[in-house]
């Protein structure tokens, strides 16, 4: 998964989701952890004071300790529901009179956090011809920028990439994607502002197939998620995609701003009601102490986190690895 951007030969396409346990693999994982550790420092600091007091020496844990940890996790935006799921088994054991040391608690917390994060069930890019990624999200989450960063990373990995400007409503949206296309060296298919988004996607996919593109990234409008018409338009767009690409050949990716914390969950709920969501990208993780929202989103909707944004540069959009993520915010 760590060389996800590198183009695979046809002989190994079926093994995209199975990383090889080789020295380069472990080196990439080590590097990824260090990037996570640096980029997630604000979330780690949010938890650090409370956890340090509990884990400073190996001792027996009390209900008061768990209450402090519970408050700290909620403030880091795991949310009440997810925090309850994580801590309830531990609270139950304490209430039954079982002794739990701080070392054991830390191990159980780490295991519990890992279990909250859902693993992908299919490779990315998918097996579509072309593989198609359909991006959703409200305005301001960094959707267009994220698409451009992914386009560059996949292009640099050897893929023939096309971006499609499906946001025809927001003023300047098409020009923004075109500027990004010029900057990262990836072509953009676009029509005029106000054009039917479904028609743009139809023509874009037709172009991609005829011209041999391997990966298509589709931008969409991001007006307020409370707007009924936006959701209906998204449904229409997915029907158009399915005229070209089978369901297993494309992925609907919801882009969320980690800074919004629990509001990201309400956004996800609205999109989830409209069309199937296959995975999530969390942006702006480096600028927030609310990194716990990753656990809340993945656990509540049973969705994998595909990437997280830890900076402004394309290389700061990193493939998500749950072991590195948990280790970065809850050190061993």
How should these model regions be labeled?
Residues 114-116, 122-332:
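P-loop/Walker A NTP-binding module and the surrounding RecA-like catalytic core of P-loop NTPases
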Residues 1-122, 128-134, 156, 161:
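Non-catalytic terminal/linker segments enriched in charged/polar, low-complexity residues
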